[in-house]
Curated annotation (Swiss-Prot):
GO terms for cellular component: ribonucleoprotein complex; ribosome. This is Large ribosomal subunit protein bL20. Belongs to the bacterial ribosomal protein bL20 family. Binds directly to 23S ribosomal RNA and is necessary for the in vitro assembly process of the 50S ribosomal subunit. It is not involved in the protein synthesizing functions of that subunit. Keywords: Ribonucleoprotein, Ribosomal protein, RNA-binding, rRNA-binding. It holds the Pfam family Ribosomal_L20. It comes from Synechococcus sp. (strain CC9605). SUPFAM superfamilies: Ribosomal protein L20.
């Protein structure tokens, strides 16, 4: 069998990992084995948190809508139920933005949900 020399392939593979690890502290950014572990962990965290971000934002929007709704004398669940009955098609992101940026308009939306 022919001898396989891994010069270029191995160096490229290592440099790819070290490039991804740039900016990591200490040996985590310069030593291949620890850098490889840190990069794998970072990629796992990134994958997990891309999904978690969607949940976190939804929770934030709901908290903001609930706070603004209670200032107008109605709970979050009653507001959302009323909006569904009134056929108001505003999603949670839009409602939260309204509550923060334009409380007057949000009050009008709450009034529509109450009636």
């Amino acid at each position: 069998m022919a001898r396989v020399k891994r010069g270029n392939v191995a160096r490229k593979r290592r440099n790819k990992i070290l490039r991804l690890a740039r900016g990591f502290r200490g040996g985590n950014g310069t030593l291949f084995r620890t850098a490889n572990q840190r990069v794998m962990k970072a990629l796992c965290n990134a994958y997990r948190d891309r999904r978690r971000r969607k949940r976190d934002f939804r929770r934030l929007w709901i908290a903001r809508i609930n706070a603004a709704a209670r200032l107008n004398g109605v709970s979050y669940s009653r507001l959302m139920g009323g909006l569904k009955k009134a056929d108001v098609r505003l999603n949670r992101k839009m409602l939260a933005q309204l509550a923060v940026v334009d409380p007057g308009s949000f009050t009008n939306v709450v009034a529509a949900a109450k009636s």
